[in-house]
Design a protein with these regions (language model features):
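Terminal peptide-recognition signature
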Residues: 31, 46, 61, 100
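Short, hinge-like loop/turn segments at secondary-structure boundaries
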Residues: 62, 80, 124-128
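Flexible, polar/low-complexity N-terminal or interdomain linker segments that lie immediately upstream
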Residues: 1-43, 50-52, 126-142
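Glycine-rich, highly charged phosphate/nucleotide-binding loops
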Residues: 62-70
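Catalytic cysteine-centered active loop of the rhodanese-like fold, especially the PTP/DSP P-loop
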Residues: 70, 75-118
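Short active-site oxyanion
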Residues: 38-44, 59-60, 80, 106
Length: 142
């Protein structure tokens, strides 16, 4: 016996969902544009493990791994925290957004995480060398 599942795709609920999605997520190309145009109302927050952050991260990002979420350093209540983790399937960033928003920080999630950032061939900063991959341009120590 074959069973067919039907979902109710209520237009009002769909609209509310997508309005929220647009308000609380951004994509890698949009974030890259914000970085390159010098938007200073953002804090880019990488919630991956410290060793993964050291191997490469979005330029200008700070690292706040899960064990530091209770007392996060570097966040700013006057700016929007753009939070990312490993991949689209990783829920660390979403969980961090819940935690940080609960502490009064404005948040957005980067869709696709660091994997999608790299797939778009956007610049990657390496902590060990203070170099940007992709542009060949050196960046100063932070």
């Amino acid at each position: 016996m074959q069973t067919t599942t039907t979902r109710n795709h209520d237009p009002a609920r769909a609209r509310a969902y997508f309005e929220d999605k647009l308000a609380f997520t951004t994509g890698p190309v949009e974030l890259d544009r914000w970085i390159k145009t010098g938007q200073d109302n953002l804090v880019i927050v990488d919630v991956r493990a410290a060793e993964d952050f050291a191997k490469g991260h979005i330029p200008g990002a700070i690292n706040v791994p899960k064990e530091k979420w209770d007392n996060p350093q570097g966040l700013n209540r006057d700016k929007t925290q753009v939070v990312y983790c490993y991949t689209q399937q990783c829920h660390l960033a979403a969980n961090a957004c819940v935690r940080f928003a609960g502490k009064g920080y404005p948040v957005m999630e980067l869709e696709g995480g660091f994997e999608t950032w790299k797939e778009n061939e956007l610049d990657v900063e390496e902590a060990a060398t203070n170099r940007l991959k992709g542009s060949g341009e050196k960046v100063g120590a932070r």
